[in-house]
Amino acid sequence: MRIFEQLESQVRSYIRSFPVIFERSKGAYLYDEQGKAYIDFFAGAGTLNYGHNHPKIIEAMIAYLQNDGILHGLDKATSAKKAFLQTLSETILEPRHMDYKVQFTGPTGTNAIESALKLARMVKGRSNVIAFTNAFHGLTMGSMAVTGNAFYRDEAFVNRANVSFMPFDGYFGEEVDTSLYLRRFLEDGSSGVDLPAAIILETIQAEGGVNVARDEWLRSVEKVCRDFDILLIVDEIQVGNGRTGRFFSFEESGIRPDIITLSKSIGGGLPLALVLLRPELDQWKPGEHTGTFRGNNLAFVAAKEALEYWSDSVLGEWVKHNSAILKEGLEALVQAFPELGMSARGRGLIYGLEIPLSGMAKEVSANCFQKGLVIELAGASDTVLKFLPPLIIEEETLREGLGIIKEAIGEVLREREARMGEVFGDR
C-alpha cells in the first residue's frame, strides 16, 4: 500500500475503509492480490447493478474493441450511440409511455446534476432551487450547493446562494407531512424563500442514510410543482437503474418528473451520464452545454447490453425476491440485538441498518471487511450500514453476507461491553 500513501492525495477515502489491493472481480465478489474473496455489498456505490465483469457485457465490449469501434466521438453520431438510444427507447421509455429527450453530459453523476440545474434555471428564468435536508447530489459547485451534508459545504468553496433547503419526508418523524411546510413557504410571500426554478430530490436518499420518501409525499411535492409552475428534477443516479425493482425508483409513486438524471449503472459499469428532459424543455442552443467526454462510446456498448435485462420482468422479480430476504434478515438482526436500538429501512436492494451508538457502524463495517464482506456507511454521522449488493446477487451469497454482518455486530458488541460497558454510552 506504500505507493498509494506516497503518491495519492489525502482525499482518497474508500482505500482507507478497505485497505487491500484488489486484483480482480466477478459477479458479486472482489478478490485481493492474495486471492481472498470478498462479498460485495457496495457495488461501486451503485455503479455495478449487474455485477462485476458481467459476461454478456464483457463479450460485447471485447467484440466492439476488436472491430476497431470508435472510443471517443464527442457528440458525433456513432453506431454505438445509435444502438444505445434505440434500446433505451424501446426497452425503457416506450413501454412506460415516457416522452423525453436525451442529453448526454460528462460521464459522472454530478455532470448530469449540473446540466439539469443549469437547464431548469435557463428555462424558468429564475435562479433559486429547492433541495432537501440530507440530500446528496454531487461535489462540483452546483451539485454541492444542493447537497445537505455540512461536511461538504465549506463556505470557502461552495456558493450557498440561490438554494433553499426544506425538510425531507420523515425529517420530523412519520407523523409530520413536510410537503405542507414546502407549500406554506411558497404561498407566503414573506417566507424569504424565492419561487424556485426547480425542486430537486431523491426518492431514496442513499448517501443521506437510506431515507425513503413515501409515495404520497412524492405525489404531494409533484402537486406543489404543478401548482407553482416549478420544474421537478428527480435524481436517479444511485437508486435508479433497477435498484428498487423497477427501472426508475419513482415508478410506484406515479409521478412524472420534468427532468431525470441518470448515471452510475446506466453505463453498465462504465462512466456514462445523461439527462432525460421533457421535449418542451429542450431549449439549449447548439453547443451551449458541452463536455469532451459526453457520450462514452464503449459505455454505450455496455449500457445497451445492460438495458436488455429490462426487456422482460425477470430481473425485476429477482430483485423483489432478494429484497424480501434482505428485509427479513435485517429485521431479524434488529430483534437479535435489542440493546442496540437498531432500525432498518429501504426498498428493493437498497437498505440501511441504523446503529445509533456512536462509531459502532464503522467498527462493524471494518469487522465485516476482515471477514470478507465489503459494506459502506451512510448518514450524516456514518451511523447507517448501507446495503447495496449487485442486483444479480445469488440468494446464497446474500444470506452469507447477512450472516457475516450478524457475526460482526456480535463481536463488536462484546468488545464494547468489555470496555467498561460502552454499549450504554453515547447514542
Curated annotation (Swiss-Prot):
Q: What positions are modified (N6-(pyridoxal phosphate)lysine)?
A: K264
- Highest taxon above the source species: Bacteria
Q: Where are the transmembrane segments?
A: none
Q: Which PROSITE patterns match?
A: AA_TRANSFER_CLASS_3
Covalent S-S links between cysteines: none
Describe which pathway this protein belongs to, using the record's wording: Amine and polyamine biosynthesis; ectoine biosynthesis; L-ectoine from L-aspartate 4-semialdehyde: step 1/3
Please state the Enzyme Commission number of this protein: 2.6.1.76
**Stored SUPFAM superfamilies:** PLP-dependent transferases
Molecular functions per Gene Ontology: diaminobutyrate-2-oxoglutarate transaminase activity; diaminobutyrate-pyruvate transaminase activity; pyridoxal phosphate binding
Output the GO biological process annotations, alphabetical, semicolon-separated.
ectoine biosynthetic process
Q: Which cofactor does it need?
A: pyridoxal 5'-phosphate
Sorted keywords for this record are:
Aminotransferase, Pyridoxal phosphate, Transferase
Question: What Gene3D superfamilies does the database record attribute to this sequence?
Answer: Aspartate Aminotransferase, domain 1 (3.90.1150.10), Type I PLP-dependent aspartate aminotransferase-like (Major domain) (3.40.640.10)
Protein family membership: Belongs to the class-III pyridoxal-phosphate-dependent aminotransferase family.
In Swiss-Prot or TrEMBL terms, this protein is called: Diaminobutyrate--2-oxoglutarate transaminase
Which organism encodes this protein?
Wolinella succinogenes (strain ATCC 29543 / DSM 1740 / CCUG 13145 / JCM 31913 / LMG 7466 / NCTC 11488 / FDC 602W)
